[in-house]
């Protein structure tokens, strides 16, 4: 019997363990009986683990240096109407007094 290829990384080196298929290359586990769930939905969590969504308001929880500027974003700065994007800095927003910015979700908390 031939084992199925990994649905995540397409590796041929998979093995079966207790009814689950496991890929040693990407550590993906799946059951052939249930359909593979692929979600295009972007999941972003704040510093406290709360799910963030487009349009949310957040507060900065740490003083952040702004690259290319001598000023800083102070703790407690409120940011309204965020937009979630792919990438390392996964929050796109406009901050009063600074203009457009990209922030990391680990430095904000949901209001």
Swiss-Prot record:
SUPFAM superfamilies: Prokaryotic SH3-related domain, Zinc beta-ribbon. It comes from the Bacteria. Disruption phenotype: No effect on phosphonate metabolism in B strains. Pfam families: YjdM (PF03831), Zn_Ribbon_YjdM (PF08274). GO terms for cellular component: cytosol. Belongs to the YjdM family. NCBIfam families: phnA (TIGR00686). This is Protein YjdM. It comes from Escherichia coli (strain K12).
